[in-house]
Regions:
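Active-site proximal loop and beta-alpha junction motif in alpha/beta enzyme cores
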Residues: 1-100, 109-168
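An anionic, turn-rich surface loop/hairpin at beta-sheet edges
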Residues: 103-104
Length: 168
């Protein structure tokens, strides 16, 4: 297993809503980093069995929601037990669902921790691509300042940079 630290959450809005097809959804917003990667966290009851075409339409609509000037990755989630969440991510740029999204998973757990719905300690998040465990550590003021993902990883490609003029 590997453990990585994500950027700190910034620009949090926990009590937002978004409307699509005449339905109002709870919709938290968080960016990881400053400026950061934008995520909308949207609870969906029965997410595992939710109609795939309907979820895709909703993801496309919320991804471009006017309250998100950068657009947003849309992280649909359902709490399925104590410190256990199921999540699906509609990813901006890909413009479809992906098997997993580490920053999205961290964003969902940040939101749920701050709302008091999970402990923030070793929260299990199941996704199509597998399972991650998230730790959202809070400072004395209650702000999430350290966000960690733990899970397996696989090498999917290797490369070599050969341009000696490349400056990093």
């Amino acid at each position: 297993l590997y453990r990585i630290r994500l950027n700190d959450p910034w620009h949090l809005r926990l009590d937002g809503t978004a409307e699509a097809d005449g339905i109002t959804y709870d919709c938290a917003y968080v960016e990881l980093g400053d400026p950061g990667i934008p995520h909308a966290a949207v609870p969906i009851a029965g997410l595992r069995d939710y109609d795939a075409a309907a979820l895709l339409r909703l993801g496309r609509t919320l991804r471009h929601y006017p309250d998100f000037p950068k657009g947003a990755n849309v992280n649909f989630y359902e709490i399925i037990g104590p410190d256990h969440v199921y999540e699906r991510t509609y990813e901006r740029g890909v413009e479809d669902f992906t098997y997993a999204c580490g920053t999205g998973t961290g964003s969902v757990v940040t939101v749920l921790t701050l709302l008091g719905k999970v402990s923030g300690k070793h929260v299990r998040v199941d996704m199509t691509g597998g399972t991650l465990y998230v730790d959202a550590e809070r400072n004395a003021a209650g702000r999430v300042t350290d966000l960690y993902l733990t899970g397996p990883t696989n090498v999917v490609c290797k490369g070599e940079i050969t341009d000696e003029n490349l400056v990093l």
